[in-house]
């Protein structure tokens, strides 16, 4: 069957749509701006070429539709239908993604008032999803849209629920999220929850604050090296439980101070067979903060402290939650005693080869997920 093109018509349940300009392309399909015949309405229609993935997303949106999308800053979903071999999902038309907004502004740091507004809206969205036990799984700059930056500045909505899953269905060791936004618990193979979405939100806010992605690397090891430099080693109890901890860390039991340490680049390459880039002059967290302060000197010290606190809470710990942003998980291990104790229920590291196969099939953070609707 031929792929839908500009000028083609799509027969939905709620009307007939004429395909206009294509706005973007993802792992499973394209998004087109479409006009509804007989009206002046425009919609964003996601045309998915993987039928199973399209059906999964439609099921997820059916559940999310029970929430008030405007009050909870979630993309409004209208209908889904099949067109030949494609699944079509009809969404409201929005303005631009945060990534496009940053690009248009030459990646200059965003004012704190804008960051604060975006943070509040994202936490409302995440809390709404948590209330129905849904995990987004792909929060990044491209998946946060501004509604209309000219008429309603910094009003945003969370979009793209193609990877959304029921929190009860998340399997231990599942790999998702693109690497620059991937939470440490995903890389380490720890039990998953809303904290992974919280981590991604922290990185979105940090990107707006700094005018650049904090972690720009495509390999998990490189990203984790930066995380450790900024926040210190993960807690020993987390490293003890991680399915993939020994890909990235080694537990030294024979030294005078036994405990976990990060593998050197050569050790990591030997374990996984993956090359590691040489990282030079990784900016520290304080250096990155000063970039923003030097640009916006008119904002007072309290504004910066408040924003930095929210960002840091988003970047800490599996216990972080959207309705408990004041509760921080301690990222740095405080004791190295008995740090190499293993929990046999969790420390089942598969071979590096099997992990690489899982990760390589998911480089874009995309993967087919089951989504049960009760």
Predicted regions and their residues:
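Protein kinase glycine-rich loop
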Residues: 19-27, 31
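A conserved loop-to-beta-strand element in the N-lobe of protein kinase catalytic cores
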Residues: 83-92, 99-100
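Catalytic-loop of the protein kinase fold
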Residues: 130-148
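C-terminal lobe substrate-recognition/regulatory segment of protein kinase catalytic domains
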Residues: 235-317
